[in-house]
Amino acid sequence: MEMIGGGEIGLAVVRHQNEGDIVFDKIQHMGYLTSDLDRAVAWFEKSFGAVKGGGGPLNPGYAMPSGGRNAYVQFGNVEAELLEPTDKTGLSGDILTMHHVGYVVPDINRAIDDLTARGFKFAADKPNVNVLGQTLLYFDSTTTNGVRMHITQLPGEPTPPNNGLEIERIVHAGYRVKDLEEAIKWYVDKFGGSHIGGGPSRTGARNAFVNFGQVQVELIEPTDPATMGADHIMDHVGYAVGDILSCVGECESHGLKFVADTPNTNSIGQQVLYFETDTSMGSRMHLTRLPD
């Protein structure tokens, strides 16, 4: 394997050169459930300068068993998918509930074959194409620790960056896990990942960062794992920016608040600053400045 430090994404990623290894190019988007789609779209527009890129009605299916409607919002170089189910039981219009993560692969058919050979199952027999022209296929969550993920092949023409907050990429999805060592091993074994760091947190929890392809996951074992109802629970998203202090100021001008006045530096050299969830629709997000 070849270690790549810094570079375009400012992240030490692990690129595997062995035949049969799975290539994840980037995290395309995070998906959120909401009981009020229009309100959620308006929040991204106001907070991040997002642009609505498309959406519409959704038939009942794996992503939303009751059906409903969705919208894609784009800001900087990233996007979010917002889903309003017909059955809104347990949802609040004030809260964005994390639903799934979408990973980009260069060739979805090859990725399906490679992942199937590794023991993964999928929620359908073949991919579908969404309103943005993206070809995607959800994993069967029984083979992904109970959390929803899908692989995505982007259309041939790249999407130009949008106006709004200058987000460079989604650096990672974060999950709370019952057993940190088992979770690390799963990503290493299943996705050919590399455990690059971690340790105790200020709250007494433990975390670990695992890179696979050109993406990353943060795994967090709480102080009392027995309180978790599932082995893996979606926890947060990290947005990479070039100038974190400038982005903090821009976010504050849009009414967002942060948990501290200045970023802290984590065990792998990333500068991180979380939003106050009272101002981010109850969902945990942070800005990240990647090491050079």
Label the model's feature ranges.
Residues 80-87, 149-154, 219-227, 285-290:
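Amphipathic N-proximal alpha-helical interface segments
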Residues 3-21, 26-35, 70-78, 91-166, 169-178, 198-199, 208-209, ...:
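Vicinal oxygen chelate
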Residues 40-45, 115, 183-188, 251:
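Conserved active-site tyrosine of GNAT-family acetyltransferases
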Residues 166-215:
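Conserved small-residue-rich
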Residues 46-52, 119-121, 189-195, 255-257:
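Conserved acetyl-CoA-binding loop of GNAT-fold acetyltransferases
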Residues 55-68, 86-100, 118-135, 159-160, ...:
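A cross-kingdom feature marking solvent-exposed beta-strand/loop segments within repeated
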